Amino acid sequence: MDCTWRILFLVAAATGTHAQVQLVQSGAEVKKPGASVKVSCKVSGYTLTELSMHWVRQAPGKGLEWMGGFDPEDGETIYAQKFQGRVTMTEDTSTDTAYMELSSLRSEDTAVYYCAT
């Protein structure tokens, strides 16, 4: 029996403040500790450049935890201190898709990951 810890990533779209925005995320992932995962969030109804995309997660039995997002005032992506060095958030404006990549995965990274605007 394989007793290796596996990390489950579930992704779901959070309702944004823009009434017509739809966010469609990639599906669930199972990863081993030490690996990395990249999840996507496709925007429709608006273009990605019109929005400020953020990523949050919710571990089992825990509250929502903000991971980072785009700061339109600075024009930069900012990350929560806890995730700096492990998370990268990017955007492909040609496809209106945002990405969040988390590396060096740990068992405590098991969570539902949300994109939100």
Swiss-Prot record:
Any single GO BP term: immunoglobulin mediated immune response
Q: Where in the cell is it found?
A: Secreted; Cell membrane
Region annotated Complementarity-determining-1, chain positions:
45-52
Q: What is its main location?
A: secreted
**UniProtKB keywords:** Adaptive immunity, Cell membrane, Disulfide bond, Immunity, Immunoglobulin, Immunoglobulin domain, Membrane, Secreted, Signal
Region labeled Framework-2 — which residues?
53-69
Q: Where is this region: Framework-3?
A: 78-115
Quick one: a GO cellular component term?
immunoglobulin complex
Where do the record's region annotations for Complementarity-determining-2 lie? 70-77
Annotated transmembrane regions: none
Q: Which residues form the Ig-like domain?
A: 20-117
Q: Which regions form coiled coils?
A: none
Which segments carry the region annotation Framework-1? 20-44
Instruction: Outline the segment boundaries, as ranges, of region: Complementarity-determining-3.
Output: 116-117
InterPro entries (alphabetical)? Ig-like_dom (IPR007110), Ig-like_dom_sf (IPR036179), Ig-like_fold (IPR013783), Ig_V-set (IPR013106), IgHV (IPR050199)
The molecular function terms in GO held by this entry are: antigen binding
State the source organism's domain of life: Eukaryota
Which region is the signal sequence? 1-19
The task this protein performs is described as: V region of the variable domain of immunoglobulin heavy chains that participates in the antigen recognition. Immunoglobulins, also known as antibodies, are membrane-bound or secreted glycoproteins produced by B lymphocytes. In the recognition phase of humoral immunity, the membrane-bound immunoglobulins serve as receptors which, upon binding of a specific antigen, trigger the clonal expansion and differentiation of B lymphocytes into immunoglobulins-secreting plasma cells.
* SUBUNIT field: Immunoglobulins are composed of two identical heavy chains and two identical light chains; disulfide-linked.
Q: What protein does this entry describe? A: Immunoglobulin heavy variable 1-24
Task: List the source organism.
Answer: Homo sapiens
Gene label: IGHV1-24
